[in-house]
């Protein structure tokens, strides 16, 4: 047991080369929290007996009850390595002690915004994959998120005990199953070739893959076995490692290595991995689980495992756990992999700086981040807020990228909308204290140097969810995090007792602080709206709201889905609007934007902040836009970065630039609340064809131009075959063959459409993938379990927006009824206005 003090940790923080910041990411229920336990136990925080069951990082009551992780939790661990291990590290280190800042993150897809927040502050990721289920949809999502942030992965294949005890596989089958899983991970990694990151694929023979069981608390890497045998036979360890994976076979008769699986007489040889690595494990399993009392002592002696007297009394699984833990402790394999193969902040920030920092790559702050310089000006990125035990206060959780953050230091707190030289979204305040996050507890420290993860007290009132903290006035913001999910499910919340209203408002404020991806808003009719990414996320948010943040009973409406408004064709004629004083006219046409372009804008490939020439190149080369149009994009909307565009196609208009700001403001307003039923607009391009302006500046101010531009945008959309898009989930269901019929019947009932169905090689499980409209997804998992006898577990991820058939302006169609309901709920007139309402005759 290593009992370590806060002083030791603080000392290690200064040796940045010996710090590792890593997050644990995986599909839901593949065993992240359970694996984290064995590392926590090594650091002497929980007892060995509890490891595997304690799930120490699941700090909330509902996490323990449901057995899922909901919030990402950070914890700092202290590890010391042998000299041999330190020699293998490819980067500079000082001494043998290491500080590992580990963040356990949720696997459930509804909470993937928590994963994004965890990934932003770490440099390496431990990807956990279930050995039976293989790489699932969420494994892929989080792995892609990690690679997009330039984070280096290492893999552990977990739940090997399931393969041995439940499926009773042979050694060769197990090897093939491992190798398939690793291959599918590498396929995902290889799509992100990043020269500055080097090769980030994982290889068992290089030591970047571990195998084990979190529940039983054992794990191994090929490197550990190579070390074992190199001592025993006196061979070089590096050579041994290469031979213990892949097609290499050892012939015991001739004592020679070969890469053919048959010897001279045609007898089949056993693969080296099976013979030297799996064989001892298989033997232990079979002799203990089949209660062969006589074999056990000789086996233990050979493997140099010493049991205490009371441990020898155990039998069956209990004995197996004890023996495997002594033989291959999980913490050793994981720590070795983390320390040797994951980058230190010094290494990582050198190549991550340019993707993290918004400003130019040669300004002082960016260079300080690149060098991870503790003496430079402070740069901290806050990725999320963590509620304290004190109601309503939060720790700001983030990472110091440059400088040193101290208690009582005066800093500039910059929100996500801050721009250099302006005063918006900026506060200059002092930090009350700096703390170290330790799972369920926090420890106070005086200061925290660059490269470490930290909690700050006293800045929570000035930041909503995330932001940058700095001491340099010229510093730009760190880039805003991109979430792979979007809030598409909403409910309206009301108080049961009118006196509680102020509490509800306060509670909603706290809720939106504590979760990176929840949106709270107020509709025009005065309802309070909470929007979340899925059913489970919504359920957790509402229970938090009722029990913690507001602490009052609430009335909750049935869930509502958010839609998008779009157009299907070009406007049938040019739309024209005149300003209120009749002196200015704007002529425009609307047309749809290709889905690919919209997706690129949403992903951030086409960015409003990019240089306009570079952006025009992308649009012209990849999407066939006309270059002159592509250069004349005035703005993106809504919120300045949405998938709608204003393109200036005018010829020689006087005073045009003077009204540009007004046009942009009007377009943001028009795309935030569309003409059909006040939802966001998506994939609409508005071309300004001509503008007639009054010669006097006073007659063409914002008050004249803004309402005109908004009306003409509406008119052009209503003339262009308006349509509605609904959000669609991608569903992945793993189930045995006999449950497939039940799945199909539920999907058909819910307008679902199956896109693929395949059997996972070597297992009896099938994977069914389908599209399911979000509107139909409520209660889907419950119905699915009923019709399949609890054998099918769905995973829902927001996938895309799909056009709904039918005319939204016709109240008799199915789409029309949705529109009508929504308009009535928001207190508008029930019928969609015709274009005449916004169109002016010459």
From Swiss-Prot:
<dbReference type="GO" id="GO:0003924">
    <property type="term" value="F:GTPase activity"/>
</dbReference>
<dbReference type="Pfam" id="PF14492">
    <property type="entry name" value="EFG_III"/>
</dbReference>
<dbReference type="GO" id="GO:0003746">
    <property type="term" value="F:translation elongation factor activity"/>
</dbReference>
<dbReference type="InterPro" id="IPR000795">
    <property type="entry name" value="T_Tr_GTP-bd_dom"/>
</dbReference>
<dbReference type="GO" id="GO:0005829">
    <property type="term" value="C:cytosol"/>
</dbReference>
<keyword id="KW-0251">Elongation factor</keyword>
<comment type="function">
    <text>Catalyzes the GTP-dependent ribosomal translocation step during translation elongation. During this step, the ribosome changes from the pre-translocational (PRE) to the post-translocational (POST) state as the newly formed A-site-bound peptidyl-tRNA and P-site-bound deacylated tRNA move to the P and E sites, respectively. Catalyzes the coordinated movement of the two tRNA molecules, the mRNA and conformational changes in the ribosome.</text>
</comment>
<dbReference type="GO" id="GO:1990904">
    <property type="term" value="C:ribonucleoprotein complex"/>
</dbReference>
<keyword id="KW-0547">Nucleotide-binding</keyword>
<dbReference type="GO" id="GO:0005525">
    <property type="term" value="F:GTP binding"/>
</dbReference>
<feature type="binding site">
    <location>
        <begin position="158"/>
        <end position="161"/>
    </location>
    <ligand>
        <name>GTP</name>
    </ligand>
</feature>
<feature type="binding site">
    <location>
        <begin position="213"/>
        <end position="215"/>
    </location>
    <ligand>
        <name>GTP</name>
    </ligand>
</feature>
<dbReference type="InterPro" id="IPR009000">
    <property type="entry name" value="Transl_B-barrel_sf"/>
</dbReference>
<keyword id="KW-0342">GTP-binding</keyword>
<dbReference type="InterPro" id="IPR027417">
    <property type="entry name" value="P-loop_NTPase"/>
</dbReference>
<keyword id="KW-0648">Protein biosynthesis</keyword>
<dbReference type="InterPro" id="IPR014721">
    <property type="entry name" value="Ribsml_uS5_D2-typ_fold_subgr"/>
</dbReference>
<feature type="modified residue" description="Diphthamide">
    <location>
        <position position="699"/>
    </location>
</feature>
<dbReference type="InterPro" id="IPR041095">
    <property type="entry name" value="EFG_II"/>
</dbReference>
<dbReference type="Pfam" id="PF00009">
    <property type="entry name" value="GTP_EFTU"/>
</dbReference>
<dbReference type="InterPro" id="IPR005517">
    <property type="entry name" value="Transl_elong_EFG/EF2_IV"/>
</dbReference>
<dbReference type="InterPro" id="IPR004161">
    <property type="entry name" value="EFTu-like_2"/>
</dbReference>
<keyword id="KW-0378">Hydrolase</keyword>
<keyword id="KW-0963">Cytoplasm</keyword>
<dbReference type="InterPro" id="IPR000640">
    <property type="entry name" value="EFG_V-like"/>
</dbReference>
<dbReference type="InterPro" id="IPR020568">
    <property type="entry name" value="Ribosomal_Su5_D2-typ_SF"/>
</dbReference>
<dbReference type="InterPro" id="IPR031157">
    <property type="entry name" value="G_TR_CS"/>
</dbReference>
<dbReference type="GO" id="GO:0043022">
    <property type="term" value="F:ribosome binding"/>
</dbReference>
<dbReference type="Pfam" id="PF03764">
    <property type="entry name" value="EFG_IV"/>
</dbReference>
<feature type="binding site">
    <location>
        <begin position="26"/>
        <end position="33"/>
    </location>
    <ligand>
        <name>GTP</name>
    </ligand>
</feature>
<dbReference type="Pfam" id="PF00679">
    <property type="entry name" value="EFG_C"/>
</dbReference>
<protein>
    <recommendedName>
        <fullName>Elongation factor 2</fullName>
        <ecNumber>3.6.5.-</ecNumber>
    </recommendedName>
</protein>
<dbReference type="InterPro" id="IPR005225">
    <property type="entry name" value="Small_GTP-bd"/>
</dbReference>
<dbReference type="Pfam" id="PF03144">
    <property type="entry name" value="GTP_EFTU_D2"/>
</dbReference>
<comment type="similarity">
    <text>Belongs to the TRAFAC class translation factor GTPase superfamily. Classic translation factor GTPase family. EF-G/EF-2 subfamily.</text>
</comment>
<dbReference type="InterPro" id="IPR035647">
    <property type="entry name" value="EFG_III/V"/>
</dbReference>
<feature type="domain" description="tr-type G">
    <location>
        <begin position="17"/>
        <end position="253"/>
    </location>
</feature>
């Amino acid at each position: 047991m290593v009992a370590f003090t806060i002083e030791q940790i603080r000392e290690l923080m200064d040796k940045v080369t010996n710090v590792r910041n890593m997050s644990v990411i995986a599909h839901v229920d593949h065993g992240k929290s359970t694996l984290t336990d064995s590392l926590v136990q090594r650091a002497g925080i929980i007892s060995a007996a509890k490891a595997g069951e304690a799930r120490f990082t699941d700090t909330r009551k509902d996490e323990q009850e449901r057995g899922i992780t909901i919030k990402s939790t950070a914890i700092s661990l202290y590890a010391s390595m042998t000299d041999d291990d330190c020699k293998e590290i490819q980067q500079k280190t000082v001494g043998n002690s290491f500080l590992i800042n580990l963040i356990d993150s949720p696997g459930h897809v509804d909470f993937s915004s928590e994963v994004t927040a965890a990934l932003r502050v770490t440099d390496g990721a431990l990807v956990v994959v279930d050995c039976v289920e293989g790489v699932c949809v969420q494994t892929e999502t989080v792995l892609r998120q990690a690679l997009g942030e330039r984070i280096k992965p290492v893999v552990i294949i977990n739940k090997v005990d399931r393969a041995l005890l439940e499926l009773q596989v042979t050694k060769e089958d197990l090897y093939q199953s491992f190798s398939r899983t690793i291959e599918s991970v590498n396929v995902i990694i290889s799509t992100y070739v990043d020269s500055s990151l080097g090769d980030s694929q994982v290889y068992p023979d290089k030591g970047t893959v571990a195998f084990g069981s979190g529940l039983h608390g054992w794990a191994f890497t090929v490197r550990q076995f190579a070390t074992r045998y190199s001592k025993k036979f006196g061979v070089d360890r590096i050579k041994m490692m290469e031979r213990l994976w892949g097609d290499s076979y050892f012939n015991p008769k001739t004592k020679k290595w070969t890469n053919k699986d048959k010897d001279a007489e045609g007898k089949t040889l056993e693969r080296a991995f099976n013979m030297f690595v799996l064989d001892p494990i298989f033997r232990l399993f079979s002799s203990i689980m089949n209660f062969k009392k006589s074999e056990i002592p000789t086996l233990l002696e050979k493997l140099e495992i010493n049991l205490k007297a009371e441990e020898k009394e155990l039998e069956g699984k209990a004995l197996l756990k004890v023996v495997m833990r002594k033989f291959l402790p999980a913490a050793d394999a994981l720590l070795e992999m983390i320390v040797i193969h994951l980058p230190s902040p010094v290494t990582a920030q050198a190549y991550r700086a340019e993707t993290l920092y918004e400003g130019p790559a040669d300004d002082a702050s960016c260079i300080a981040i690149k060098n991870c310089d503790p003496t430079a000006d402070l740069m901290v990125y806050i990725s999320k807020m963590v509620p304290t035990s004190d109601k309503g206060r939060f720790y700001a959780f983030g990472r110091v990228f440059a400088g040193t953050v101290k208690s009582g230091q005066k800093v500039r707190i910059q929100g996500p909308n801050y721009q250099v030289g302006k005063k918006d979204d900026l506060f200059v305040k002092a930090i009350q204290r700096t703390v170290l996050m330790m799972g369920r507890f926090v420890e106070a420290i005086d200061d925290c140097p660059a490269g470490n993860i930290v909690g700050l007290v006293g800045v929570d009132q000035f930041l909503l969810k995330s932001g940058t903290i700095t001491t340099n006035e010229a510093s730009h913001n760190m880039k805003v995090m991109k979430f792979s999910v979007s809030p598409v499910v909403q409910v309206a919340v009301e108080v049961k007792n009118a006196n509680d209203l102020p509490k509800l408002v306060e509670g909603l404020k706290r809720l939106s602080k504590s979760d990176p991806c929840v949106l709270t808003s107020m509709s025009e009719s005065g309802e309070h709206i909470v929007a979340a990414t899925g059913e489970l996320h919504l359920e957790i948010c509402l229970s938090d709201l009722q029990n913690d943040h507001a602490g009052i009973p609430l009335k909750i409406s049935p869930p509502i889905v958010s839609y998008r408004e779009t157009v299907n064709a070009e406007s049938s004629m040019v739309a024209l609007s005149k300003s209120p004083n009749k002196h200015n006219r704007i002529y425009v046409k609307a047309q749809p934007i290709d889905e690919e372009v919209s997706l690129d804008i949403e992903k951030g490939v086409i960015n409003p902040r990019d240089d306009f020439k570079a952006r025009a190149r992308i649009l012209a080369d990849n999407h066939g836009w006309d270059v002159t149009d592509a250069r004349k994009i005035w703005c993106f909307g809504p919120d300045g970065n949405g998938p709608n565009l204003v393109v200036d196609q005018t010829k020689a208009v006087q005073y045009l630039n003077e009204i540009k700001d007004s046009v942009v403001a009007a377009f943001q307003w028009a795309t935030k609340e569309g003409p059909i039923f006040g939802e966001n607009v998506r994939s609409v391009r508005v071309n300004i064809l001509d503008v007639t302006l009054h010669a006097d500046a006073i007659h063409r101010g914002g008050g004249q131009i803004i309402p005109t531009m908004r009306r003409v945008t509406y008119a052009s959309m209503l003339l262009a075959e308006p349509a509605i898009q609904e959000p669609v989930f991608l569903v992945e269901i793993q189930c045995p063959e006999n449950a497939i019929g039940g799945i199909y019947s539920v999907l058909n009932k819910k307008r679902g459409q199956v896109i693929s169905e395949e059997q996972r090689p070597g297992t009896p499980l099938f994977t069914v993938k389908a599209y399911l409209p979000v509107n139909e997804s409520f209660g889907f998992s419950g119905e699915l379990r009923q019709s399949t006898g609890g054998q099918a577990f769905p995973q829902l991820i927001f996938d895309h927006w799909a056009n709904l058939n039918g005319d939204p302006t016709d109240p008799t169609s199915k789409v029309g009824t949705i529109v009508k309901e929504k308009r009535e709920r928001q207190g508008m007139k029930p019928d969609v206005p015709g274009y005449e309402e916004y169109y002016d005759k010459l």
